Amino acid sequence: MHFHERFDVIVVGGGHAGTEAALAAARMGSKTLLLTHNIDTLGQMSCNPAIGGIGKGHLVKEIDALGGAMAIATDYAGIQFRTLNSSKGPAVRATRAQADRALYRQKIQNILQNQPNLRIFQQAVDDLIVENHQVVGVVTQMGLAFESPAVVLTTGTFLSGKIHIGLENYSGGRAGDPPAIALANRLRELPIRVGRLKTGTPPRIDANTIDFSQMTEQKGDSPLPVMSFMGDVSHHPKQISCWITHTNEKTHEIIRGGLDRSPMYSGVIEGIGPRYCPSIEDKIHRFADKSSHQIFIEPEGLNTNEIYPNGISTSLPFDVQLNLVRSIKGMENAEIMRPGYAIEYDYFDPRDLKNSLETKAINGLFFAGQINGTTGYEEAGAQGLLAGMNASLQVQGKEAWCPRRDEAYLGVLVDDLSTLGTKEPYRMFTSRAEYRLLLREDNADIRLTAKGRELGLVDDARWAAFSEKLESIELELQRLRGQWVHPNSPLIHALNPHLNTPISREASFEELLRRPEMDYSKLMQIEGFGPGLEDPQAAEQVQIQVKYSGYIQRQQEEINKAVRNENTGLPLTLDYKEVPGLSNEVIAKLNNHKPETIGQASRISGITPAAISILLVHLKKRGLLRKSA
């Protein structure tokens, strides 16, 4: 049975990747269908109730700069906001928000339901319709076929998902949801490499059974940060505290005593878990010398008693979970509301994707989120936006787009995945980026919003606000460069008390701001130098662009050298055995990876600069030298 309408883009799955993919395609004018097994769980935060953090906050800002929903929803749902690394340089500062699950889900659903060009339909997908290596639609559980030349799969942990608690296990996509078995079996028929990964979640605790007086209170920041460039503090709901406690030697003894019934340590789970978010049993085993581990006690919302104990993700049997929880200071009488568990699921080797997130094997089929081996809401949302955008571009007959590594953390993420692949759940860190001074949270809009506007992702309101901000920054920089103060100026009496060394020669306001003891807000408060910019985002940009101008210029020069051959395209049909001069090892690796560009090829382990030179000569001789989009 065929549905009565055709769609330009179909998105399968309504998590963080799926919602951003559907919204992106619809914003660009494509007639879009979002298929989900349950409309009520669209935008669900399946694991921790938080958005942002080191590297992750940068991705959220980039999603926002391209018109996405994640940051906006976080501003409306965030019950505690903090700026991490605030004492460090701007490149590694990151915003993190504790979020009310219900408010976040509610805001995402509201955005989806009010998005033009977007239809939502509740049905699980069991099959893909593929003809001559081209996707042409999907078939749902009840045999209903939907036709489309572009399909984005954002299946999360649902593909052959298996939930483990102790030595017991059962099929599930997450707690309370069925797995996608039929779709997983269908995908295994495709010429794409498949593997298994695992992730986990901690038990949820009843707040009424916790003694918070035994814990350290952790308040949010003041003044309050915002996540979206369009956000405002007035959007935030009531702000509340989190708390900190620790495991102890007794906790560790209980965990060690239960390892024989752990699915991870008894060989029941084969999938590899996230390195940077390990289970508590993994921490105790790997860091046996540590006598305690920190636990963040995080409320799940304003109108729920559920507490998320961040740091004790576990798949141990329930009796062991209860004992280990009650061994922790402040939780001696705690009651578990939901047990912790591990979930194992299928993922597909992202090296089989183009950097548009389209599969190399099937035209029009895109993957985004955990299906590509990543972990985290932010990583999923960023991929979803890119996949939905490129699906829409393809339907419109336009070239795909993906930012370079020097343009966005999204570019780093996709390049890492499509070039190097991953054997464990991949999460973003600032340390993964070579050019992180240019890839800051604060300038994500300056880097990406103009491109988003060109692609059709950015609406009029965001574009107007961005243009106004950009103009105010430029005018203020011109003012600082054009106004001067000299030793005999009447302004000097107000200025000198704020300087480590008094002014001895004429200096521009810009030079004064560059001094280490001076910052923008301080300079603007001195009589005769203000009033300056009212918009704190614009003021921050002025300060960073002035103070770091030398470093930024140097990094830009490095990038200009590096990108000379970065985008030189490599035909996916090229058989590297035909390239004379390449070693057998290099030939095998290049034929295995099928890189899209010289830049990607150069980042594959074992591909030498000499091999790259040989490739460039071969391409030139064959008339194949071309620049990738």
Swiss-Prot record:
Its main location: cytoplasm. FAD binds at residues 13-18. GO terms for cellular component: cytosol. Coiled coil: none annotated. Pfam families: GIDA, GIDA_C_1st, SAM_GIDA_C. InterPro entries: FAD/NAD-bd_sf (IPR036188), GIDA_C_N (IPR049312), MnmG (IPR004416), MnmG-rel (IPR002218), MnmG-rel_CS (IPR020595), MnmG_C (IPR026904), MnmG_C_subdom (IPR047001), MnmG_C_subdom_sf (IPR044920). Its cofactor is FAD. The keyword NAD applies. It comes from the Bacteria. It is found in: Cytoplasm. GO terms for molecular function: flavin adenine dinucleotide binding. The keyword Flavoprotein applies. Keywords: Cytoplasm, FAD, Flavoprotein, NAD, tRNA processing. NAD(+) binds at residues 273-287. GO terms for biological process: tRNA methylation; tRNA wobble uridine modification. PANTHER family: GLUCOSE INHIBITED DIVISION PROTEIN A, PROTEIN MTO1 HOMOLOG, MITOCHONDRIAL. Homodimer. Heterotetramer of two MnmE and two MnmG subunits. NAD-binding protein involved in the addition of a carboxymethylaminomethyl (cmnm) group at the wobble position (U34) of certain tRNAs, forming tRNA-cmnm(5)s(2)U34. Belongs to the MnmG family. This is tRNA uridine 5-carboxymethylaminomethyl modification enzyme MnmG. It comes from Shewanella baltica (strain OS155 / ATCC BAA-1091). The lineage of its organism: Bacteria, Pseudomonadati, Pseudomonadota, Gammaproteobacteria, Alteromonadales.
